[in-house]
Amino acid sequence: MQWDGSKNAGFTEGEPWLAVNPNYKTVNAAEAQDDPDSILNFYKKLIRLRKQYADIIKGSYTLLLPDDPQLFVYERQANGQKLMSISNVSKEEAAFYWPDGSEPERAELLLSNYDNDSGTESRITFRPYETRVYLLA
């Protein structure tokens, strides 16, 4: 584990039996902790969201667009609240169209791994590996 930018990436004061990756000064836990856009901090936000909407996480699960090769889209619903998770699982851009009957203008963007507008247009272009979670009214 690359803990920080110190000798041997902070892993050991002894001689490691495997070489430390040369990127240890910039790719390490200490740097990730300080970077609000790091994967570590994205997962922390995801965990907070899961705790905040615990009832929904235990609620019903509906897979949307099961045949789409690029987008993994599902809804979780409970107690009158609904979350929609949309993930582009490909290395190419992907177009998402809000389902008929949905009200994207009332959707609240709760989490994204990119800086985004709210995505309330009828069509959203997702960047490679982009994920968004919306609270639907």
Task: Cite the ranges covered by each PLM segment.
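A conserved amphipathic helix/loop scaffold
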Residues: S87, N116-S118, Y129
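Short helix/strand-capping connector loops at secondary-structure junctions
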Residues: N23-K25, N113-N116
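Short beta-strand element of the conserved SAM-dependent methyltransferase core
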Residues: M1, Y74, D115, R132-L136
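Beta-strand-rich binding/interaction modules
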Residues: E93-Y114
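Short, glycine- and charge-enriched coil/turn segments that flank and shape catalytic ligand pockets
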Residues: D34, G101-P104, S118-T120
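Loop/helix patches that line or flank the sugar-binding groove of alpha-linked glycan CAZymes
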Residues: M1-L83, V89-A94
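A structural detector for beta-sheet-dominated domains
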Residues: D4, L64-P66, P99, S112, ...
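C-terminal beta-strand-rich structural cap/linker in extracellular carbohydrate-active enzymes
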Residues: T120-A137
